[in-house]
């Protein structure tokens, strides 16, 4: 070994020891008579010292050649520091150098390798190997490792087997486009990279592996939005001979284990909420329950008073911002402008102020008497000091707008701290949703989700299938969907019916999923599962919004790896071997002709998926 200790382990008890350290030079301070070198490695930082008149001339000369990020090997004696640094674990000691070797020099880095860096995102992504030297980034990857390790510990203790599933699979598009891989041995044919191991884990259940898991890379070729990655990681799980309650208990146990071991936080028992209630009271299928402000419907008591905006709305609904009656007009106007932003889309906002003296005043006093305002306040269960904020319009749309307002108010009031955690199971999703434009049914989750009432699903008329609920569940933490899954269909007749409802012909279903349908004829057990968004889970534990901070080598928001310049053009020889002709569609992009894009019959708002799970 080139070193005897790391740069993070020496303490006052090590004084008088001779040690050898290796690492990167963080900074050099030359005060003439004294030279200090801060040496950094993955484990921490240690201060090295040389002294004019006591250190050899050769050592002093070598030390004065050092620059930022030089790799060195230093041998010396541990001594007690005169000016201790309580902010450093090694701050009680320093190493008086007796030998110094430069193992490698370094160009001047393009940004400061410090917790507070001056490097922009693109620069840090281009030089990611330098960014990874920063303590903040290193800690994120250590946390990711810990989450991975503790996941395996819990699942192994519960008799789960970690089984790897194929990466080169058949293209069965699952809500987004597949990444396709040409087959040289089979000209004109393509593999796809998996968006999820969905069908393979179901086949493992058919094979008798009753408890499976995998921490697995998945891929989705979709239009990128902020904080999305074309490749992402799932904790993918499946169980046989279970009901929904068994799944919820098992994986609530996993999440509580992770909070305990990773965050040293005792997560309370996770409550359950019906999808219908989540939408009614929070306007979202992933409500943030760290704070209250449930929606209150007012339609029946505010219409027919001459206020046209309310009279023409099919829903009038609001929230009570407790203790906010002292908001200035400027602050209220700022909230009005917030809801009128294109991203929210409301036309305006009505407010009712319940002053500390008990009087009520609103932005629509012209239409509502004091008694009317009192009825509104009573409906909100408001008290003096509260501020009621009201939106109106189309039902589903206005609930979404009020959800945005609720979260904004919660953030402004400090009710959504990163170190506070509230988890929630959302259950009983609709099985299907009807696309008015396409005039057909789409699966709310995916086509392998079992109806809660199978008999009703099989017997109801086509136009009444919207009343059937799914045996599906999502885990939400702090308003972020971190995982989800379902009880699976395991009977071929039911699965065929699902494909039929979704608009598949018998031939299309057989071509895409014939292998699964056939497997169901060989004794498929009842089974269920879910997948957690591993990257998103790590970001929640780390208290940051970006999943990119927890991925060693992420892509940028354009799906590019600017460090290795990928994706890139491949040479003509490779294309010829693959029997592919390439047509340049526009600058910087290539198109492969004669590949028909197929759309999988899943309709879900993936713009609001936080962890890139398409099938789980």
Curated annotation (Swiss-Prot):
Enzyme superclass (EC):
ligase
Keyword Ligase found: yes
Primary subcellular site in the record, as a coarse category: cytoplasm
| Location in or out of the cell | Cytoplasm
Q: Map out region (Aspartate) in residue numbers.
A: 198-201
Spell out the Pfam families in the cross-references.
GAD (PF02938), tRNA-synt_2 (PF00152), tRNA_anti-codon (PF01336)
Record: residues binding ATP? 220-222, 229, 481, 533-536
> What Gene Ontology molecular-function terms does this entry list?
aspartate-tRNA ligase activity; ATP binding; nucleic acid binding
Which SUPFAM superfamilies does the annotation name?
A: Class II aaRS and biotin synthetases, GAD domain-like, Nucleic acid-binding proteins
Gene3D superfamilies membership:
Bira Bifunctional Protein, Domain 2, GAD-like domain, Nucleic acid-binding proteins
Query: Record-annotated residues binding L-aspartate?
Result: 174, 220, 445, 488
Keywords for this protein: Aminoacyl-tRNA synthetase, ATP-binding, Cytoplasm, Ligase, Nucleotide-binding, Protein biosynthesis
Annotated Gene Ontology cellular components are:
cytoplasm
Reactions catalysed, semicolon-separated, are:
tRNA(Asp) + L-aspartate + ATP = L-aspartyl-tRNA(Asp) + AMP + diphosphate
The EC number(s) given in the record are 6.1.1.12
Q: Which PANTHER family match?
A: ASPARTATE--TRNA LIGASE, MITOCHONDRIAL (PTHR22594:SF5), ASPARTYL/LYSYL-TRNA SYNTHETASE (PTHR22594)
User: Hey, which family's this protein in?
Assistant: Belongs to the class-II aminoacyl-tRNA synthetase family. Type 1 subfamily.
- Describe its assembly: Homodimer.
Function (record text): Catalyzes the attachment of L-aspartate to tRNA(Asp) in a two-step reaction: L-aspartate is first activated by ATP to form Asp-AMP and then transferred to the acceptor end of tRNA(Asp).
Q: Tell me the protein's name.
A: Aspartate--tRNA ligase
Organism expressing this protein natively: Cytophaga hutchinsonii (strain ATCC 33406 / DSM 1761 / CIP 103989 / NBRC 15051 / NCIMB 9469 / D465)
- Gene name on record? aspS
